[in-house]
Amino acid sequence: MENKKVAKALPIQDPYLNALRKEKINVAIYLVNGVKLQGRVDSFDQFVVLLRSNVTQMVYKHAISTIVPARDPKAYEFEAQETEAKDSE
């Protein structure tokens, strides 16, 4: 039963990060220890986010507290609605 809860949480995270990546939106990533990182999401997988600024940093997701985009991603609104429609089927 617990695995189903995790599976439902992932469709929110992946489309959101993907929209930030595709639209090359600057983000501030706050870590659980209070450190603020800034840059653009270059890539991501299940465990890490590659954040590009002057250099590329590999940030482990378990260390991330909050991601704050400079603006809302446009593509995310469409993908979120599409995901909600699939979930209701």
Curated annotation (Swiss-Prot):
Signal peptide: none annotated. It holds the Pfam family Hfq. RNA chaperone that binds small regulatory RNA (sRNAs) and mRNAs to facilitate mRNA translational regulation in response to envelope stress, environmental stress and changes in metabolite concentrations. Also binds with high specificity to tRNAs. SUPFAM superfamilies: Sm-like ribonucleoproteins (SSF50182). One of its GO terms (cellular component) is cytosol. One of its GO terms (biological process) is regulation of DNA-templated transcription. Homohexamer. It comes from the Bacteria. One of its GO terms (molecular function) is RNA binding. NCBIfam families: Hfq, PRK00395.1. This is RNA-binding protein Hfq. Belongs to the Hfq family. InterPro entries: Hfq, LSM_dom_sf, Sm. Residues 14-73 form the Sm domain.
